[in-house]
Amino acid sequence: MGKWTIKEASELLQEIGTEEDERFQILLKDERKGIQNLISKWRKQKKKMQEEKEQFLEMSKYENALRKQGISYIAGIDEVGRGPLAGPVVTAAVILPEEFYIPGLNDSKKLSEAKRELFYDEIREKAIAIGVGIVSPQVIDEMNIYQATKRAMLDAVANLSYAPEHLLIDAMKLPTSIPQTSIVKGDAKSISISAASIIAKVTRDRMMKELGKTYPEYGFEKHMGYGTKQHLEAIETYGVLEEHRKTFAPIKDMIKNKL
């Protein structure tokens, strides 16, 4: 049998699952640099896939433990937007099916924007139910951000099309009769919370990008309402908007100093 071309070897490696495969052993003996580079790349991909699988299994332990108790509708809950000076706080509640699998799923803050958008679409397609809660800057100023976040989370749960049997919440306790588990850094420890963080993050980012079109001088589409130098300079130059949180420093001080 003649040697495979580089193109043929590349296509062959896509079919090979393990190094024990006879075809892989043949390629391994091929000393051509191009073939050895393909093998190195294949091994890296396999290693990454295995690491992602192990991470996903580790992040599924809360859900798996609840399913062993006969609980099926488990809602992961997370928020985005507690810290910004402008825009709403957005929360999401997500119920995933038992067979759900997206390798690489993680806390939304650790993912690129492109990856978040990709996962957002996949979660939307595969989830049993998704609920979103949005609380405006005006209500945040009335209630304080902690209480507003709680309200948004309860709204997200209420907006689910299926009633959850258990809540997995990122570092919060909610005033509800539904059994719940609060998990510190839950968006990196639970697939349901991670999925919720992605839904909330993409939802809020899209809202802030729209706000950026309405008020281009503020650059909302870049900083998403956080207190960057550009944002603070825009507030000084153009003033405070309805979308700003008036009880947050330094906006609170800016308003006070102008009175």
UniProtKB/Swiss-Prot annotation:
Its cofactor is Mn(2+); Mg(2+). Pfam families: RNase_HII. Keywords: Cytoplasm, Endonuclease, Hydrolase, Manganese, Metal-binding, Nuclease. It is an enzyme of class 3 (hydrolase). GO terms for biological process: DNA replication, removal of RNA primer; mismatch repair. Manganese or magnesium. Binds 1 divalent metal ion per monomer in the absence of substrate. May bind a second metal ion after substrate binding. PROSITE patterns: RNASE_H_2. This is Ribonuclease HII. It comes from Bacillus cytotoxicus (strain DSM 22905 / CIP 110041 / 391-98 / NVH 391-98).
